[in-house]
Amino acid sequence: MDFSHIVSEDKIKRAIKDGDFQNLPGMGKPLPKDDAAHLPESLRMGYRILKNAGMAEDEGALKKELMTIDHLIEKCYDEKEREQLIRKKSEKQLLLDKLVDKKGMFSKPASAFYKNKVYDRLGRNRPSSS
């Protein structure tokens, strides 16, 4: 044990003895769910760093929703329902586009080379400012 560990343990024991940990907010309540619980332990810290930097938002979830909506549109026979699905797809696509723009994914020169290929692959119109 190093000196800082001993001092820390001593302060914690003193606080427990003085009752400083009694009646804390949230006492007896479950901890909030860990949003990185589905990831392996070795990736969690990196995920949290990316999330705190605003780089690991729900992009994957939006992409999954878009794929699901595409499949539903393919199988849909009711015109009203199809129109609702198409409208929902447009909304989700706009959210995804905003998220990608927020990240500045294609603002770096190294990635600008692949920009048009990515847009072609996704079947989206190329932005006018290439």
Swiss-Prot record:
It comes from the Bacteria. InterPro entries: DnaJ_C_subfamily_28, DnaJ_homolog_subfam-C_membr-28. It holds the Pfam family DJC28_CD. This is Uncharacterized protein YflB. It comes from Bacillus subtilis (strain 168).
